[in-house]
From Swiss-Prot:
GO terms for molecular function: toxin activity. This is Pesticidal crystal protein Cry22Aa. Pfam families: Bact_surface_Ig-like, Lectin_L-type_dom. It comes from the Bacteria. GO terms for biological process: sporulation resulting in formation of a cellular spore. Transmembrane segments: none annotated. Keywords: Sporulation, Toxin, Virulence. Promotes colloidosmotic lysis by binding to the midgut epithelial cells of hymenopteran species. The gene is cry22Aa.
Length: 722
């Protein structure tokens, strides 16, 4: 019970039943005792004169084992009320209750040892003159005219007139309307019996006041006269006389080795019409045992039996046995009389190719019951099945079931697989502008059959056709057919209209002396596709190439490819190797000199450079020149020169001159223009172009670029004009 500050009786009545155990399995009430099943509290006596109540054990204890008894007790509200509560462990019969009054319901218990909580010490049954202070509790004292309330271990049958003290008695607080916790422990190994009594509330003590009696007390009894090879039962009693009090107890724990006999018997299932003997029927395995008496199977009697094996149903048999000490046990088993179960399943029709699970398909309507009407559908299994949903025909499924009683049943049903018609047709490849009638073209190979093998080709129709033979591509034709059973089928074929593949490749310029691989050079941008758009670049080959990057000029590369359909195509690109292509990206002057003869100097400035990191810059009017090897030019051929220039500020002229003889007289310029007249390109540079013709090649000619103001020259190119 939870500790609470409870001062009134009516407050304790609200304690939850879960705080205390239900005593009815091990106790029976006697006299004025009543048990409240809502609170699990037993009232031994009301506050009425001349009452006597007890709860006596319905079983026995094996004293070879320890036990613990814990309970909350209520001794009443009247400080001079009578008589108290006692508990005894004895060798008497089951249900024994001793002398009432001062005997507290335990006096006379055979070979018993008790513990009394006596609140009225002047009863005729109270002991006098003992050596444990029991008699000293009698008399009339200030505040205690009926003797001192006290507690301690007593013998229940040493003296037939009173309970005899076995150990030192101790005073306890008079009844005060409070609950107290009593704990009694038996230590079988050390043969020691102890008791502990504790008040549960303390709010009646004023600060600074010392209580007259202890609030917690302990008692010990060493080597009590228990016969350990014998059974002991127990009784808890209370009484009132000329004075009274309300006496109650709520048992928290009784942890002991109880020794009542035990019946063992199993539930059984019996086939309808079988002979049934409740003591010998196989599977019941009827048996009764007792710790002391041993095997009691022969003493079992059938207390009740309503089994009728002529009719299915659930019946009950109750067995009873009693040991030599009067303890008893009952056991009721369940007897189920059963017949074979039943299975219900219907014939079904399914489509060819359909997924079919006979156990779960709702069309089968599978259900099963045992003979008691319990649903056992989940226990049904497929015993056999030859169903092949890929082939039309009639098949058989056999179900089986075994119920929980061992009864068996089988059920077979028919499964008809209804097939669909089939269409056969081939994929087709066509040339552009070929004609195609999908229903009659022999290349399609169109045929249809119903599920019985009958030819229904004449019933085929074209459901969809997007073929356009004027354009290459992948197309589709869908056929459909309905047979005489109403079953339908469709067939899709692929029609490929094939054209030539295509190659994409760019004309490119390659620097003199540069390594050039036409198949992999990213400037070429080589790609190839078949007429259906599939990439076939990896299949492209070089059919021919006359490229010689050691000599400036114009060259050709011819690519070719054949697709998986055998279609072939070629592609020719032009490759130009410039005479000059100097943009100074890497800082190399590439043979350019000042007109006086020394190498030009380049400025490293990525922001000002046209390409890369370097650019030619001069703040003055300056001319630069480069000698062209005779081998890089062809006589009677036109060439184009391009200069990329940028004025530092404002605008000025830029002149380009071609001198066929470096030592010869001045020649007309290729062009002499304001820089601003050029085409605007990257980084504010202007592109200026002009052409010249090579008419003789006796000496290595000279190209002169003259910048008439401060500015930048980002690059110079010379290429042959076709």
């Amino acid at each position: 019970m939870k500790e609470q500050n409870l001062n009134k009786y009516d407050e304790i009545t609200v304690q939850a039943a879960s705080d205390y155990i239900d005593i009815r399995p091990i106790f029976q009430t006697n006299g004025s005792a009543t048990f409240n099943s809502n609170t699990n509290i037993t009232t031994l006596t009301q506050a009425i004169n001349s009452q006597a109540g007890a709860i006596a054990g319905k079983t026995a204890l094996d004293m070879r084992h320890d036990f613990t008894f814990r309970a909350d007790i209520f001794l009443g509200t009247k400080s001079n009320g009578a008589d108290g509560i006692a508990i005894a462990f004895h060798r008497g019969s089951i249900g024994f209750v001793g002398t009432k009054g001062g005997g507290l319901g335990i006096l006379g218990a055979p070979k018993g040892i008790g513990f009394e909580l006596d609140t009225y010490a002047n009863a005729p049954e109270d002991e006098v003159g003992d050596s444990f202070g029991h008699g000293a509790m009698k008399g009339s004292f200030p505040s205690f005219p009926n003797g001192y309330p006290h507690a301690g271990f007593v013998s229940t049958d040493k003296n037939s007139r009173w309970l005899s003290a076995l150990a030192q008695m101790q005073r306890i607080a008079a009844p005060n309307g409070r609950w107290r916790r009593l704990e009694i422990r038996w230590d079988a190994r050390n043969k020691e019996l102890t008791a502990n009594l504790q008040d549960l509330t303390f709010n009646d003590i004023t600060v600074g006041e010392k209580p007259r009696t202890p609030r917690t007390a302990t008692w010990r009894l060493v080597n009590p006269a228990f016969e350990l090879d014998q059974k002991y039962t127990f009784v808890i009693g209370s009484a009132t006389g000329a004075s009274n009090n309300l006496h109650q107890i709520g048992i928290i724990e009784f942890d002991a080795y109880f020794t009542k006999p035990t019946i063992e018997a199993n539930n059984v299932n019996v086939p309808v019409g079988a002979t049934f003997n409740p003591k010998t029927y196989p599977g019941i395995n009827l048996r009764a045992t007792d710790e002391i008496d041993g095997d009691l199977t022969s003493k079992i009697i059938v207390k009740a039996n309503n089994v009728n094996t002529s009719k299915t149903g659930v019946y009950y048999v109750t067995y009873y046995v009693e040991n030599s000490y009067g303890e008893s046990d009952e056991k009721t088993i369940e007897v189920t009389v059963f017949s074979n179960p039943t299975i219900i399943a219907s014939d079904v029709e399914i489509e060819k190719g359909e997924s079919f699970n006979p156990l779960t398909d709702s069309r089968v309507g599978l259900s099963a019951q045992d003979s008691l009407g319990n649903d056992i559908t989940q226990n049904v299994k497929v015993k056999s099945s030859n169903v092949d949903t890929s082939k039309p025909g009639e098949y058989e499924v056999v179900f089986e079931v075994t119920d929980s009683f061992g009864g068996k049943a089988e059920k077979d049903f028919k499964v008809t697989v209804l097939g669909q018609p089939s269409i056969e047709a081939n994929n087709v490849e066509l040339e552009i502008d070929d004609s195609l009638d999908p229903l009659t073209d022999a290349k399609v190979g169109l045929r249809a059959k119903d599920s019985l093998g009958n030819d229904i080709t004449k019933d085929i129709k074209v459901k969809f056709n997007n073929v356009d033979t004027s354009n290459s591509g992948k197309y589709e034709v869908i056929f459909e057919v309905t047979d005489r059973f109403g079953k339908k089928a469709e067939k899709s074929i692929e029609v490929l209209v094939l054209g030539e593949p295509s190659i994409e490749a760019n004309d490119v310029e390659v620097n003199k002396g540069e390594t050039f691989e036409p198949l992999t050079d990213s400037r070429v941008g080589l790609r190839a596709k078949d007429s259906l758009g599939n990439d076939i670049t990896k299949d492209v080959k070089i059919k021919s190439s006359n490229v010689d990057t050691s000599k400036p000029g114009e060259y050709e590369v011819v690519f070719e490819v054949t697709d998986r359909f055998g279609k072939y195509v070629e592609k020719t690109i032009g490759v130009i190797v410039p005479v000059i292509d100097d943009e100074w990206e890497d800082g190399n002057v590439n043979g350019w000199k000042f007109y006086a003869g020394q190498d030009i100097k380049l400025l490293k400035d990525p922001d000002k450079a046209y390409k890369g990191d370097y650019v030619f810059y001069d703040s003055r009017h300056v001319a630069i020149s480069k000698t062209i090897p005779l081998t890089d030019l062809q006589i009677n051929t036109n060439y184009e020169i391009t200069v990329y220039a940028k004025a530092e500020s404002g605008d000025h002229h830029l002149k380009v001159t071609y001198k066929k003889d470096p030592a010869g007289p001045e020649e007309p310029p290729v062009f002499n223009r304001l820089i601003s007249t050029g085409t605007l390109v990257e980084k504010d540079y202007r592109e200026l172009k002009g052409t010249f013709r090579v008419t003789e090649l006796n000496k290595a000619p000279l190209i002169i670029v003259e910048n008439f103001g401060a500015g930048y020259i980002g690059g110079i190119r010379i290429v042959k004009i076709s």
